Design a protein with these regions (language model features):
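Active-site-adjacent pocket scaffolds in enzyme catalytic domains
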Residues: 110-111, 115-193
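Active-site beta-loop-alpha junctions enriched in small/polar residues
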Residues: 11-15, 59-61, 85-87, 122-125, ...
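Acidic-and-aromatic substrate-binding clefts and catalytic sites of carbohydrate-active enzymes
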Residues: 32-37, 55-67, 88-98, 121-129, ...
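Active-site beta->alpha N-cap acidic-glycine motif
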Residues: 1-76
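Active-site flanking residues adjacent to catalytic metal/cofactor-binding acidic residues
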Residues: 8-10, 82, 142-144
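An active-site-proximal "capping" alpha-helix that borders the catalytic cofactor pocket
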Residues: 100-109
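Conserved, mostly hydrophobic/aromatic
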Residues: 11, 47, 56, 80-83, ...
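Short, well-ordered coil/turn segments that N-cap beta-strands
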Residues: 2-6, 50-54, 75-79, 113-118, ...
Length: 193
């Protein structure tokens, strides 16, 4: 049988996505605990069985809260990507807060893997006006937060001007590569709601 190339990614949010929304009661937290305690071992076993590498985008809060599970992901040879600190949307942060989250999470990734993340996925699948500059400044090679294609990588633009009553003016392409995503290919909306 011939080889096939696939790109499999996981957003290993655990409880961080609920904390970011102020949902710290037992119900939401228990939904966040399912990932590290139930889903992660099953997923790692499946990936190991079929010898499939994957990229895991992990918030810094998850790296600190579930260090053993994150070590298991890393030990299995999977890529560890950056996914914010506590899953707060970058557009809701100041430039300084966004940079602090980039730095703080990357420090945890370096502790786990020995090097900074090459890939970034925004917790909200959206970027702030500062995100592209910060990602380039901090040495990221690719982003995986946007949906401008179904599966073909493309270069991220910087400097778009989008106004309600005027035609869009698109900025210049950067060296940052976009690995597009799609809500229709993500399991969260199907299983959570």
């Amino acid at each position: 049988m011939g080889r096939h190339i696939v790109c499999i990614t996981f957003d290993f949010d655990a409880i961080s996505g609920w904390i970011a929304r102020g949902m710290t009661t037992p119900g939401p937290i228990s939904r966040g605990e399912f990932g590290p305690n139930v889903a992660l071992p099953r997923i790692l076993a499946l990936l190991r069985k079929y010898d499939v590498p994957a990229s895991w985008f992990i918030p810094g809060h998850t790296l600190e809260t579930y260090p053993e599970q994150c070590r298991q992901v890393c030990a299995a040879g999977h890529e560890i990507g950056h996914h914010g600190w506590t899953h707060r949307p970058p557009a809701s942060l100041s430039r300084e807060q966004e940079e602090d989250e980039l730095t703080r999470t990357n420090e945890q990734i370096i502790k786990l893997t020995g090097r900074g993340a090459r890939g970034y996925r925004s917790p909200a699948w959206d970027l702030s006006p500062h995100s592209v500059d910060l990602l380039l400044q901090h040495g990221f090679v690719y982003d995986s937060s946007m949906m401008g294609d179904d599966y073909t990588p493309y270069r991220v633009r910087r400097g778009d001007i989008i106004e309600l009553e005027k035609p869009a003016v698109f900025g210049r392409q950067t060296r940052l590569i976009e690995m597009p995503i799609s809500w229709s290919l993500d399991d969260f909306p199907h299983f959570e709601f």
